[in-house]
From Swiss-Prot:
It comes from the Bacteria. Keywords: Cytoplasm, Hydrolase, Nuclease, Ribosome biogenesis. GO terms for molecular function: nuclease activity. This is Putative pre-16S rRNA nuclease. InterPro entries: RNaseH-like_sf (IPR012337), YqgF (IPR005227), YqgF/RNaseH-like_dom (IPR006641), YqgF/RNaseH-like_dom_sf (IPR037027). Its EC number is 3.1.-.-. Gene3D superfamilies: YqgF/RNase H-like domain. Transmembrane segments: none annotated. Belongs to the YqgF nuclease family. It is found in: Cytoplasm. It comes from Staphylococcus epidermidis (strain ATCC 35984 / DSM 28319 / BCRC 17069 / CCUG 31568 / BM 3577 / RP62A).
Length: 142
């Protein structure tokens, strides 16, 4: 059993998908999708800090998009900056960057196989990607 819950984030330029673990550390469930505006530096950090405190989260896992050759591109740099902003706002929390290559594609495939409509997929894809990121992390620490 974990001492605290773990939050998983899929950070994009317009949304942040959020997933949360159970206290056993076995499963990740989709929690929410935050609307953000990266261009205007509106990153939803205050909302995220509230979610972290309300859910007694001790660790946050942020997806780190890498290129297939393991290099970090533009989206990866943006995720690292997001981590730094979050860490400034809540220094007591552990933040882990997790290789998220293909997590959004896996989430999309899973939703397609479940015959979810395009409109519904668009609403939940980031949350689903956060679930894939967090579940990968949880599986690695078992």
């Amino acid at each position: 059993m974990l001492k605290h819950k773990i939050l998983g984030l899929d950070v994009g330029s317009k949304t942040v998908g959020i997933a949360i673990s159970d206290l056993m550390g076995w499963t990740a469930q989709g929690l929410d999708t935050l609307r953000i505006n990266e261009e205007q530096d509106d990153l939803g950090i205050d909302q995220l800090v509230k979610i972290i405190k309300d859910n007694q989260v001790g660790t946050v896992v942020i997806g780190l998009p890498k290129n297939m050759n393991n290099s970090i591109g533009f989206r990866g740099e943006a995720s690292i900056k997001y981590k730094e902003k979050l860490q400034e706002s809540i220094p007591s929390i552990d933040i882990v960057m997790w290789d998220e290559r293909l997590s959004t594609m896996a989430a999309e495939r899973s939703l397609l196989e479940a015959d979810v409509s395009r409109q519904k997929r668009k609403k939940v894809i980031d949350k689903m990607a956060a679930v894939f990121i967090l579940q990968g992390y949880l599986d690695s620490i078992q």
